[in-house]
Amino acid sequence: EPSLFDTEHAAGSPPDQFSENGQNWGFPIYRWDVMSRNGFAWWRKRFESMADYFKAFRIDHILGFFRIWEIPVKHVSGLLGHFSPAIAMTEKEIKEYGFPFDARFCSLPLVHADDLKQIFGRYASEVCCRYLRPFDSDYYTLATKNFYQTDIAALDPTAVVGGEDTIRGLMRVATEVCFVIESGKPGAFHPRIHFEKSFRYAHLSLEEKKAWQRLSDDYFYKRNDDLWKQEALSRLIPLLSST
């Protein structure tokens, strides 16, 4: 039943000790809102069928009933995903934490001129001319607006100055955002996971870093707890009566 799946996003996981960029599993996410309209019939049928063969079974990745790490299909890295569902932040909220916010500056992938050499080595100047463009006097962004990680990954290494190293560098630049914008919701911002390990974070002032820590801690460890609890209960309780 294709209508039950969101093919514009892929499921994955945020970074952990095993994967610094997170994971992108490549398969679509469930459209729980659609599933709920007919009482989760698709899930009920699955459970009923399994009950014909097993007395008990374990649901793997049970956290998927609470929330999923969703990544737009135009991206590859788990760093560019966010929890779904999740209560996104507004510009007003972000500023209330004391973090200086400009939508374009915070959501576009930007790399400081001082970091180009570290990312691209001796090819920095050529890469900058071909694949980047100035954002302001200090920062560069990707050369074209719709130049996403999937486009970068599709580049032919033999046709790119610096080959695979340059492609990896461009993939890294694509993750250099402060906030991920929720698909279809221009004013809904999610803090980029592990932003503290980005090149951009190093250019923040001490006060800006403290503000980021406050909003990041709230978003990832407090803000969505009640939402996820209610989401899981609304899905799991009806399914427990399936068999």
Task: Cite the ranges covered by each PLM segment.
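Catalytic cores of glycan-processing enzymes that make or break glycosidic bonds
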Residues: E1-T243
